[in-house]
Amino acid sequence: MTDSEYMDRAEAALAAIEQGCDRINDATDADIDNQRVGGMITISFKNGSQLIVNLQKPLQEIWLAARSGGYHYRYDGKAWVDTKTGEEFFGNLSREASLQAGQPLEFAAA
C-alpha cells in the first residue's frame, strides 16, 4: 500500500471514530468526549479513563492504547486487523470503549 493509500484509509477510520462518538452521545448517556489533534484521537469517559487512537505512518499502522494494553492494526485489504490476533479494529475499539464506559458502545467503519 502506498503512503497515500494508507493515509486515505487511516483518515477514514479516524473520521468513523469521530462520527461514532457523536452517534453514541446522541443515542446513549455515555457522555464520551473526543478530541482530535492531527493523527491522534483521545476518547475520554465520565470515569476519567481514556482510549487513545493514533496513526503510525512509518509502519502504516493504527495504534490503540487502552486500560487493557496497547494494540497495533494493519490494513489487510478489507479491514484494519490486529497484528497479533487478527481481530478487527472497530470490534476491539467497541469492546474496549464498552469496558471503560461501563455500558455497551459500538463503533463501526464508515
From Swiss-Prot:
Pfam families: Frataxin_Cyay. Gene3D superfamilies: Frataxin/CyaY. Keywords: Iron, Metal-binding. One of its GO terms (biological process) is iron-sulfur cluster assembly. One of its GO terms (molecular function) is ferrous iron binding. The keyword Transcription does not apply. It comes from the Bacteria. GO terms for cellular component: cytosol. Involved in iron-sulfur (Fe-S) cluster assembly. May act as a regulator of Fe-S biogenesis. PANTHER family: FRATAXIN, FRATAXIN, MITOCHONDRIAL. NCBIfam families: FeS_CyaY. This is Iron-sulfur cluster assembly protein CyaY. It comes from Variovorax paradoxus (strain S110).
